[in-house]
Amino acid sequence: MGGKDGTNSREMMMCSRSAAVVGRRQVVLRTTTIQRTTTKRRAATLTTKNNGNKDDEVYRVMSKNQELSVISVTATKMIAEAQGRHKAAPTATAAIGRNLIASLLLGSFKGDEETVQVTFRGDGPLGQLTAVSDNLGNAKCLVGNALADPPLRPDGKLNVGMAVGKGILSVSRSHPSWVQPYNGQVSIYTGEIAEDIAVYMRDSEQTNSAISVGVQLDRELTVVGAGGYMVQVLPFASDETLDYLEKHIPTLDSPSTMVESGMTAEEIAKAILGDLGAFEEVETRLTPKYGPCCREELEGRMLKAVASLGREEAMKIIEEDGKIEVTCEFCKEDLVFNEEEIEKALQGI
């Protein structure tokens, strides 16, 4: 369900917003690469600009009547880091940011070591878009084409829906102790991310939710605001609470506008609850971070990728280049392996 945008086209070049509500009464939706090159790619160093919200945060609280659960996210720094690592174009940055925030909304505060993977496989120029997060607020993403940047929508907004295209949204929840992951999928509804996640939550996890995610870029293409929220309607919620929620949410600014203005995750959550109030005795917080892709994990995963080439192909690359350089598609970090390291990896298969 959309709200006020609050974006002045003369002051803000790009505003990316995705929002949806699925209510109990069926409220209508509204709005690892192996390289053969000696050139190292480095993540761009980007600065973030917002007026007071210095730190990214994931915040969860219930309404005072305990009929709603709210998770809110401020993630300007995280999305700026993702933009830099992937060297993403504006629309790709918006799509990456929205999906990272959505994965945080779905994955934070779950059981220990539980992870969630959110994947859009659309036919748009963006290609596959995947975000992975865990219960501690760590999240990372990969994208097929980080340079995807289709023309703006008629309203001047970034056209994330066109970039994603039509296809399948799949969500996989996993835990080391589970025999197999829980997998669910739905058709991509709009490609605008939040609408699709709301439909997934309703159809696959039977949870009614109000979801909004957004990313704002300025004229220099710097991320100036990124955030989102998810309001989950608990099974015993009264009609009065639902009526209030449906009337109140459209009056709110987009989450990216709220973050850009300096609001914290807690302030956003309490603005969403409004007159319902917050049951602060059960609030919880996390600090989201991009990653992790620790070197030890990368080395093991990348050596397996190299070994999968087979001895003949791997040795051919070593003979021609003297090394094999591998890039992690999540963090875009490069690792270089020499002949001795490759030989050990090949012996292990």
Task: Describe the residue ranges of each PLM region.
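N-terminal mitochondrial targeting presequences
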Residues: M14-C15, L29-K54
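N-terminal chloroplast transit peptides
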Residues: M1-T31
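Residue-level detector of intrinsically disordered, flexible termini
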Residues: S18-A19, R42-A43, M162
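Cys/His-clustered metal-coordination modules, chiefly Zn-binding fingers
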Residues: K247-I349
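Intrinsically disordered, low-complexity regions
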Residues: G3-T7, R24, K166-I168, K323, ...
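Interaction interfaces in information-processing and related assembly proteins
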Residues: K49-L286
